[in-house]
């Protein structure tokens, strides 16, 4: 009884104390054009004066975080409260009204969902005239104002790449769960994606004010489905034990936090003794939560064990600062896989957001505390820290030096350190946006040094240099100009014509067009792009509009690399491929409404693949014609055969290269090449003509082969599960200076295309099966329904849709269902933890799920119990499935899916699909 608690506290002379979340006194609108201030909705955003002009940034006081979750879990709603309480906005935006700061695209406001990630910067605790202090901080960290660079990410599965490229540059994340739905399918997907990048995460259980919210059940699902030990830092506070949700009980500080007032700024704090007087049940549960928290930490952190013994083995006597330090150590050491701190709240009711912000500052890492970024330079891979120390350059130079001509160790070290001194800044372009007024905006995370306004940036992926005329600090759709973007910060470079997602940008002290060797080869780990599975034709309204349409498509692809454009050689149609139906719908809206392309998009179709049924035999082709006014002549031999990663024999160990691309294996044989390494670390051969090194040969042969594999010989779909063996003979295929990269690529494409055609007309042997067959995307599908709908949904998947049920469980751990891009890194054996038994996890009881319920409500609870179906289903059968699922589950079912693999069709199914595609086959 909250009112009784307040009254008793006053009667005893212990007035409830307000939490010291500083009031913001010194806000100022940045100097922006009046036209900008007149924009609808813009007036709510205001900025810290310390952001403009740019000041020196303390990395210890910086947090680069993302908000990740299932769709409709409350990501944007929580973000709006964070901006409001930090003082950045004057009012709280509403998703339903379309007045949010981070969802600013017309399509986002119309649909009420996040489509593209939005970056925004604020301070927590709020800075007061550039100097923030808190009289009663939770920890030394939350006593100082921190700069928080926050990215609000989409929750829909079709925008997986938008989440991936945001996670690539983040240091920490807040995963928001719906307290009613618990851990949903898309939650598992984004959690697994964050794990591949080793990002520490905390969990915020939202919507605790809703009917059916179950904090305890959600905690147990975190353990069983996300694979970490839940560290319950807060428990929900319901008025009278089972009334409305009014606040949280803090297990770290042993206090109750009660929210009152419409905007949530009024927060009152009650000690454990005060809770004992009026909320004894809550106080007892809070003690149990503290004991469980200390016990859990003691299993993973030796220091907290020492603190426990220093406090006479009293769990309640361990200081909050010691607990926070222990939580932070466990979180950072395990990268969010061992310990998962859990908090509670109801963002829409303005409850729980300020303590969540405190936890972002207290628990999540600064840029200096994150795992060392991976880099590659001159063919040598290592960490950024090794590069900056000079050790990686020493290794690269020693590897590149010809045998017998190595310099002394001291000289190599001196050269390496001198080279590193010329590196002024290094950053990764993780997003490109075409803004109607500002032009092309390239979002950059700086990992070393700084990128300054007016400096020359060298793109090591494209080998081009561009000047950075303007630099911006973004606040969703608005921006403030800055002089530089320093290490650990996220900013925007305006006006770059060539930079793409995943490119590395380097600035050197020499400010020359090309950095000194080998800095011109420095590359940060790129961003993986998942394969598209849907496509639609795009046609201009007239021939005069065709050029404009292709220019708009090029801009669209630069913004979103998960889209793909190809040309159907038979029909001449332009095909746009994407991750899902909604993905292509949004791309169409962007193309027509924003980029003003006068074009029409056809119906959305499935991207099938073609695979060989037999081998082709070797085919040799000589290309001999002019290319761009220059005579070119080269040759190549290609041979086609089926490929299966598990059953196909290993390629020739003497191969020049073996590459897996788009599900195909390309093997390059060049037995007669005499390969040597030059002083730059590049491979050369005296047999090759000048200007053509071994890497250029590899690239030319690979590109030519990939171009041919993009179109199958029988059904015109891209090839898959195909091994192409390319053989290059210097005596038969190299013709002096006439042989260039372009002619080699053209010869390879010609040979590979002919070999593909021979699969049908001239197979390798009379016994070989001629032709190719179709492959279709087989999807990993996770469906969430209640017990009452389980039978109908399982029957529909296994019979009507030709799917295969993998598991039928209440709890499906993420490790068993990979819904993401495969992780190419070697897993840490210490983090390969066994499944967690939910029975061993502390979780507070849920007041609305009592076992003493009488009558038929127990049966009703059983029928409403959430169940999870994991299945593998052909993509064709999942098109439009959501509407059907909702009809089977009374509107409560949800699902998420991603590509598992491409699978060969049976002859009857292939015939049916071709009949549907072409009318009659």
Curated annotation (Swiss-Prot):
This is Ribosome-releasing factor 2, mitochondrial. Residues 1-55 form a transit peptide. Residues 60-368 form the tr-type G domain. Belongs to the TRAFAC class translation factor GTPase superfamily. Classic translation factor GTPase family. EF-G/EF-2 subfamily. Keywords: GTP-binding, Mitochondrion, Nucleotide-binding, Protein biosynthesis, Transit peptide. GO terms for molecular function: GTP binding; GTPase activity. GO terms for biological process: mitochondrial genome maintenance; mitochondrial translation; regulation of mitochondrial membrane potential; ribosome disassembly. PANTHER family: RIBOSOME-RELEASING FACTOR 2, MITOCHONDRIAL, TRANSLATION ELONGATION FACTOR G-RELATED. One of its GO terms (cellular component) is mitochondrion. GTP binds at residues 69-76, 152-156, 206-209. The keyword Amino-acid biosynthesis does not apply. Mitochondrial GTPase that mediates the disassembly of ribosomes from messenger RNA at the termination of mitochondrial protein biosynthesis. Not involved in the GTP-dependent ribosomal translocation step during translation elongation. It is found in: Mitochondrion. Its main location: mitochondrion. InterPro entries: EF-G-like_DII, EFG2, EFG_II, EFG_III, EFG_III/V, EFG_V, EFG_V-like, G_TR_CS.
